[in-house]
């Protein structure tokens, strides 16, 4: 089994972990519909990316109404 050769001090451990923090993404406004979207991603509301429709978004239907 692998065992650490030497003890890692709190200082060295914390210095190594100093780069592990998560950074919140900066949402941008969709130029087509105005909703907030992640940069370099398809808009979830309208399906546009780079002023083109990439994904056809359909209206959500209620499953209870379809079953009845």
Curated annotation (Swiss-Prot):
One annotated GO molecular function: structural constituent of ribosome
UniProt-listed Pfam families: Ribosomal_L32p (PF01783)
Keywords: Ribonucleoprotein, Ribosomal protein
Segments traversing the membrane: none
Cellular-component GO terms for this entry: large ribosomal subunit
InterPro entries: Ribosomal_bL32, Ribosomal_bL32_bact, Ribosomal_zn-bd
Ribonucleoprotein found in the keyword field: yes
Region of interest (Disordered), residue spans: 1-20
A biological process from GO: translation
Source species, domain of life: Bacteria
Family classification: Belongs to the bacterial ribosomal protein bL32 family.
Name recorded for this polypeptide: Large ribosomal subunit protein bL32
Origin organism lineage: Bacteria, Pseudomonadati, Pseudomonadota, Alphaproteobacteria, Rhodobacterales
């Amino acid at each position: 089994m692998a065992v650490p050769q030497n003890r890692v001090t709190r200082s060295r451990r914390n210095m190594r972990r100093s780069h592990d923090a998560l950074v919140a993404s900066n949402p941008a406004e969709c130029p087509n519909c105005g909703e907030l979207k992640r940069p370099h991603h398809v808009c979830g509301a309208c399906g546009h990316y780079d002023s083109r429709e990439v994904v056809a978004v359909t209206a959500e239907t209620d499953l209870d109404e379809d079953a009845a």
